[in-house]
């Protein structure tokens, strides 16, 4: 090859390499410039929410609580339309205050009537009826709002005329209406069955009782009207049903059922009614009579069952129905309300219902709440491991913090954390059981003044809910944290006065009477400061109430006062948290036995399962106030105990049954 040709090739290769290098460098500079510009822009970057389609925006807004949805209505026309649809889609017509959680949003898909917490029952109901009137006016004046309502739940005690008015509007103009819940007025039957939209769209069937209370005179036209209503409404489209009569009686004597009902959600009320027996003499169903519930309801479709007993005993027919439900193995949600426990029947029932995901049990004995029998509890542990929601009463043979033995109070401490020690030393012993005679019981006044935990339940400090995660939690009587503290201080003051334990008031003493503190407490570290709401309705957390706060102190005279500081909101919250700590071993049993558990309402205290550091623990839903759990490390302790037991006795491995029995 001539040298000149060789040189030209080398020169061309060099130029190509150089051009490529320059191009790479230029590209790198461009990339760096882009990154710098993007970083600069990202500092002020806001996600363009308005660019989302309406369907996605509705999904985003569905996770907002009611006050935020109301604010969205004021932004612009587009957001107003989306938020309005969410606001009115599902309405809960309550007649008492709904309690909000200070820890999480609960049942936010319901729109509620905003009612104060401290009003008397009659006053609260009057305000609820006034708000219901305004809602009716809104629906009458705005057809677009009426057309988005899908589900409405009515409280029994609201004005019956107003109930009929709103149902008439919805049944005739609510083209989206699908479900009516808690319809208890028989006069509404014709409104629903003849409504322009409800007669074809509503998939729920609520049989209204003859009267608000059982064992009253049944109107003569009740059964004929019910028979007519059944003939108009019973169809294969029904998915939700509420009955006040035994289904076998209903469909053998009053309506000749010819197909199995594919009901998803069934609610049965068991109560005594004095119907005219003439209607239940001759069967009108052709062919063989219905003999068991699986001939009425399709076993494959029934998922939710609620039984509410109004009786103090289980009747023979009611026990037969419980046995019938053993066949419904696809049940996922079971609620047994105000029922007397029958251990053998219920143990047998739970052994068959292995697919349960939700369970609520409220047992009564002579109209007094009764803890779940250990045998029933054990059968649930063994058979229902898929449970995600549990609501029951169970003490696991652990005595209460304030226990009564014969005529004397006893204090039982299960948890020795710093806060629990302060509760026992500074609050229970320092304020409530300050003197030796305080431990003796003479009358009910002693319990009202000193058993703070019983009074939390008696005065309804904690709200009631059908299911705290799915339905609003309502107060069953006027009460909030401020009122509760005031009431307890008044009870304590009256008790101290009756025992001549009040002391002369010291004027201008900024410290008043210091709380009695044990020697051991003096060396303990200070508890975590609890931030407590000072608002009457306990809606917002906005103030720190110091332990010595006397904003709720009661007085009985200008010259005498308590020999100790008054109870404070902080005291009540600390006692409430100590109550949860007290049953640590039971909470651990639930965590061990139910790996899918999300909500637990144990002894009327609602808690939610949270995961921290790869460990599941319970946190209280109400009055959380930076609650400090005593469950941390339970899984490691459990594994260690299981290993030790296995090493000690290889032929006797630990089981859930043994754990429950020991507990």
Curated annotation (Swiss-Prot):
Gene3D superfamilies linked to this entry: 1.20.1280.50
One Pfam family cited in the UniProt record for this chain: F-box-like
GO MF assignments: protein-macromolecule adaptor activity
Superkingdom of origin: Eukaryota
Pathway: Protein modification; protein ubiquitination
GO BP term (any one): ubiquitin-dependent protein catabolic process
InterPro entries hit by this protein: F-box-like_dom_sf (IPR036047), F-box_dom (IPR001810)
Occurrences of domain F-box (ranges): 46-91
Keyword field: Ubl conjugation pathway
GO cellular component: SCF ubiquitin ligase complex
Note: Present with 195 molecules/cell in log phase SD medium.
Subunit structure: Interacts with SKP1. Component of the probable SCF(DAS1) complex containing CDC53, SKP1, RBX1 and DAS1.
Function: Substrate recognition component of a SCF (SKP1-CUL1-F-box protein) E3 ubiquitin-protein ligase complex which mediates the ubiquitination and subsequent proteasomal degradation of target proteins. Probably recognizes and binds to phosphorylated target proteins.
Record protein name field: F-box protein DAS1
């Amino acid at each position: 090859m001539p040298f000149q040709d060789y040189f030209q090739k080398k020169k061309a290769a060099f130029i190509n390499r150089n051009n490529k290098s320059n191009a790479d460098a230029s590209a790198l500079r461009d990339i760096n410039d882009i990154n710098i510009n993007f970083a600069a822009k990202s500092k002020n970057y806001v996600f363009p929410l308005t660019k989302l389609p309406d369907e996605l925006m509705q999904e985003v807004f569905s996770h907002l609580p009611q006050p935020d949805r109301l604010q969205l209505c004021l932004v612009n026309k587009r957001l107003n339309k989306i938020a309005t649809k969410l606001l009115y889609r599902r309405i809960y017509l309550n007649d008492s205050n709904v309690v909000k959680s200070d820890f999480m949003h609960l049942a936010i898909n319901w729109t509620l009537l905003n009612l104060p917490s401290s009003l008397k029952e009659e006053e609260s109901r009057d305000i609820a009826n006034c708000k219901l009137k305004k809602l009716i006016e809104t629906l009458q004046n705005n057809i677009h709002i009426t057309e988005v309502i899908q589900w409405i739940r009515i409280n029994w005690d609201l004005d019956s005329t107003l109930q009929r008015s709103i149902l008439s509007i919805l049944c005739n103009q609510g083209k989206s209406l699908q479900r009516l819940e808690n319809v208890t007025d028989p006069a509404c039957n014709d409104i629903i069955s003849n409504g322009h939209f409800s007669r074809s769209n509503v998939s729920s069937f609520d049989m209204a009782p003859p009267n608000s209370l059982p064992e009253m005179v049944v109107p003569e036209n009740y059964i004929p009207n019910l028979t007519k209503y059944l003939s108009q409404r019973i169809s294969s489209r029904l998915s939700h049903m509420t009955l006040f009569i035994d289904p076998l009686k209903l469909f053998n004597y009053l309506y000749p059922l010819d197909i199995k009902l594919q009901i998803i959600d069934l609610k049965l009320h068991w109560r005594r009614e004095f119907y005219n027996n003439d209607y239940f003499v001759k069967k009108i169903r052709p062919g063989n009579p219905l003999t068991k519930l699986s001939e009425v309801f399709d076993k494959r479709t029934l998922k939710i069952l609620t039984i509410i007993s109004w009786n103090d005993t289980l009747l023979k027919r009611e026990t037969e129905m419980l046995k019938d439900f053993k066949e419904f193995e696809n049940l996922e949600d079971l609620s047994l309300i105000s029922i007397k426990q029958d251990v053998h029947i219920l143990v047998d029932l739970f052994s068959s219902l292995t697919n349960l995901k939700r369970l609520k049990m409220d047992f009564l004995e002579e109209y007094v709440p009764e803890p779940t029998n250990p045998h029933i509890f054990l059968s649930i542990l063994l058979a229902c491991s898929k449970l995600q929601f549990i609501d029951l009463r169970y003490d696991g043979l652990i005595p209460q913090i304030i226990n009564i033995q014969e005529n004397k109070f006893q204090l039982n401490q299960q948890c020795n954390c710093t806060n629990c020690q302060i509760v026992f030393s500074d609050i229970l012993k320092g304020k409530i059981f300050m003197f030796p005679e305080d431990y003796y019981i003479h009358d009910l006044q002693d319990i009202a003044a000193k058993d703070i935990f019983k009074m939390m339940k008696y005065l309804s400090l904690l709200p009631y809910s059908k299911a705290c995660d799915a339905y609003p939690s309502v107060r069953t009587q006027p009460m909030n944290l401020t009122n509760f503290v005031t009431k307890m201080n008044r009870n304590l003051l009256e008790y101290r006065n009756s025992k001549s334990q009040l002391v002369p008031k010291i004027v201008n003493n900024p410290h008043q009477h210091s709380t009695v503190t044990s020697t051991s407490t003096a060396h303990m570290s200070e508890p975590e400061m609890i931030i407590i709401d000072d608002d009457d309705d306990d809606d917002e957390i906005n103030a720190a109430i110091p332990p010595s706060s006397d904003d709720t102190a009661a007085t009985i005279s200008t010259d005498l006062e308590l020999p100790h500081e008054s109870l404070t909101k902080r005291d009540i919250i600390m006692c409430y948290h100590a109550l949860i700590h007290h049953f640590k071993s039971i909470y651990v049993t639930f965590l061990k036995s139910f790996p899918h558990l999300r909500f637990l309402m144990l002894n009327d205290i609602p808690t939610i399962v949270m995961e921290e550091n790869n460990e599941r623990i319970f946190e209280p839903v109400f009055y959380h106030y930076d609650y400090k759990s005593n469950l941390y490390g339970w899984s490691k302790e459990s594994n260690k105990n299981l290993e030790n037991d296995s090493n000690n006795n290889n032929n006797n491995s630990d089981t859930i049954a043994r754990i429950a029995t020991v507990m």
